[in-house]
Regions:
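Bacterial Sec-dependent N-terminal signal peptides
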Residues: 1, 5, 10-16, 21-52
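Carbohydrate-active catalytic/glycan-binding domains of CAZyme proteins
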Residues: 50-504
Length: 504
């Protein structure tokens, strides 16, 4: 865009808010050297993310709860942020919630913020404790369940907000649910319309909800903390707790329950630390599950759905949903913050069941799920398979949301990026963003690593740009155009090359 934009210098640190169709920006006026607040109004597309893992780019999105509403998948994650100065340093810090949706599990739309800690009537407006949420539909209304730190007292409470649309606007109830003291709410609406709520806090608990979806159906029990009989903590008042502890779960730390029904089986899934913590070790969480013929158990522990992360991300948190005949598991890890496991990002994989209802183990991938359009920007660093010498690094370590680059270090190096739809390709060329420090050659092929039909060939000439290893965008004519959905392979044939993206 020309005109106004030619004269403005907009700094990333000066952007205050991006919401809906408005961008609120502070602009440094070079003439008067002061800050002026303006609002630029555009009909902007809402932010989207691509098909690969992580599925959300631009913000941290942990604890993803996926639900199917109106033939779309909606994801309700928590929103990790960097701690404000003096607040919750080196700990989880979350001040609001966003909601995302997709019709193809490839293109994700951010519908913006739906609830902030500042508009929860009973919550601490500076608590930064809006952890894992859930959202369900019943009788024409959408019910959003979320934990928060209360203004009065200690610990967590769980509140409810309602809306007429899965995207909001949501209106918070004036008080949290009585008898639910904890985090990680999950609500299961059974086939007969009865709703159940599960949460973690003093173990994993579950309870029936009343028809209004805002109250527990049952008596509350007075629970006294051990500190009441201890001179070190004599003033901790008892609390009223509803529901019941879930029986039949394994020993060890558990949180984040997610319950669902498939056929006649009920599943209670949860993050679980299966390692030994008694010797000072700090093993990370697995995702595990139990099964029952009843929504509140007793439960029969079955095992692991997903093993521990292969990095230092201590937590995992998930949801499981069926969409268009396929089951998926949504989870998180710290892809964009490798040295900080308090800033996490949502991922998704396919999940499968055995004939007896048990769940097959799921393995984490870069590629994730969904079909990528060849006409979109493809990120080969999210490959499905690769030779052992291929490596991945951030494009910009100061802005990790720019994603990754992949390095093919020598002739014979290869990678495969699965499920690319070429049906929309009308141009006669391919584009790549690459860098190399010397002459390099590589090809794009259909299918397997080095035996598939060549789609396009690229040559990077040594010289000024190559010797500096600077990024450049190259174009090459198509020698062949695949039909429909197929795999894309990239093979290195001379030298070494780094690739950021590919597009047809």
């Amino acid at each position: 865009m020309g005109g106004l934009w030619d004269d403005l210098h907009i700094f990333a640190m000066d952007i205050m808010t991006i919401k809906s169709d408005r961008i609120h920006i502070y602009i440094l006026n070079n003439t008067f050297m002061n800050k002026q607040a303006i609002t630029l109004l555009f009909m902007l597309p809402v932010l989207t993310a691509g098909a690969q893992n992580p599925i959300i780019r631009g913000i941290y999105a942990a604890d993803p709860t996926a639900r199917v509403f109106n033939d779309k998948v909606y994801v309700y994650p928590s929103h990790d942020i960097m701690p404000p100065e003096g607040q919750r340093q080196d700990w989880f810090c979350m001040a609001d919630y966003h909601v995302f949706s997709s019709e193809n599990l490839t293109d994700w739309t951010d519908h913006g913020m739906i609830i902030s800690q500042e508009n929860v009537p009973w919550g601490n407006p500076e608590g930064y404790s809006m952890w894992a949420p859930d959202c369900v539909y019943k009788d024409g209304k959408y019910y959003f369940y979320f934990p928060d730190a209360p203004k009065e007292g200690r610990g967590f409470a769980i509140g409810v907000a309602t809306a007429d649309s899965p995207e909001g606007p949501f209106v918070c109830e004036p008080e949290p649910i009585k008898g639910v003291m904890g985090i990680d709410p999950c609500v299961l609406v059974d086939n007969d319309g009865q709703a159940y709520i599960y949460w973690s806090g003093m173990g994993i608990r579950g309870a029936k909800l009343k028809a209004n979806m805002k109250e527990l159906d049952g008596e509350l029990t007075e629970l006294r903390f051990p500190g009441n009989a201890n001179a070190q903590a004599p003033n901790i008042p008892p609390i009223l707790v509803g529901g019941q502890a879930m029986e039949g779960l394994p020993e060890g730390f558990k949180e984040g329950p997610f319950a669902f029904r498939r056929g006649d089986w009920y599943y209670l899934t949860f993050p679980w630390v299966r390692g030994d913590t008694s010797n000072g070790q700090n093993p990370t969480e697995t995702l595990a599950y139990s099964m029952s013929r009843s929504p509140l158990g007793p439960w029969d522990f079955k095992g692991i759905i997903m093993a521990e992360h292969d990095n230092t991300c201590w937590t995992n948190h998930h949801s499981i949903v069926e969409y268009k005949g396929q089951w998926y598991i949504f989870y998180h890890r710290n892809d964009y913050s490798p040295s900080d496991d308090k800033r996490r990002s949502a991922r998704v994989e396919k999940i499968a069941f055995n004939d007896d209802g048990t769940i097959q183990e799921v393995f984490q991938t870069k590629r994730g799920v969904g079909i990528s359009q060849a006409t979109s920007v493809l990120q080969p660093d999210r490959y499905s398979a690769a030779s052992d010498d291929v490596s991945v690094a951030y494009v910009d370590t100061l802005d990790r949301f720019q994603g990754w680059q992949v390095s093919l270090p020598k002739p014979g190096s290869w990678l495969c990026y699965s499920d690319v739809d070429f049906s929309g390709v009308t141009k006669g060329n391919a584009m790549v963003r690459v860098k190399a420090c010397a002459d390099a050659e590589f090809s794009l092929r259909e299918g397997s690593m080095n035996t598939g039909t060549v789609i396009a060939r690229f040559k990077v000439k040594g010289g000024k740009d190559a010797s500096k290893g600077e990024w450049m965008t190259l174009t090459a004519p198509l020698e062949y155009t695949p039909k429909g959905v197929t795999d894309l392979a990239i093979t290195c044939e001379l030298g070494a090359v780094d690739i950021d993206w590919v597009q047809f």
